[in-house]
A protein has these predicted regions:
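A short acidic, often aromatic-flanked loop/helix-cap motif at beta-alpha or helix-coil junctions
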Residues: 69-71, 116-120
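A general structural signal for well-ordered alpha-helical segments in protein cores
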Residues: 9, 45-49, 95
Length: 120
């Protein structure tokens, strides 16, 4: 799982290229132009899911944990039922793996589509 400033993804993608190839990577990074600069602008135009796939070549990307705020996540276990966690990805097996992990920590994965749906 990557949960870093979006601007760090180009360097991480290069540094970890061999390590992440073929691995499921849950991408919880959101592009904020004021913080992350030009790469965030590009991600906002293209869509963060598709841009992350370019920046992390060979990884099996699943976008998750970036559409529900931290405050809401922290309150999720105080209420009955499960909070839905939107996830997006193009690899069905990677989505299944991510869904299992998300359920194990108490959320309900909600598949919203492919990486093109993982906009921000």
């Amino acid at each position: 799982m990557f949960a870093v400033p979006y601007g760090a993804l180009p360097e991480l993608g290069q540094a970890l290229r061999d390590s992440i190839k073929g691995k499921v990577v849950i991408d919880a990074c959101n592009p904020f132009p004021r913080r992350d600069g030009e790469i965030a602008e590009r991600a906002r135009e293209k869509g963060a899911g598709l841009m992350s796939a370019e920046l992390l070549p060979g990884a099996r990307i699943v976008r998750a944990f970036n559409a529900v705020g931290a405050d809401r996540m922290g309150q999720a276990h105080e209420e009955p039922g499960r909070v839905g966690m939107p996830i997006a990805g193009d690899d069905e097996e990677a989505l299944d793996i991510a869904s299992t992990l998300i359920r194990e920590i108490g959320y309900e994965p909600v598949r919203i589509g492919g990486l093109e749906m993982g906009k921000y």
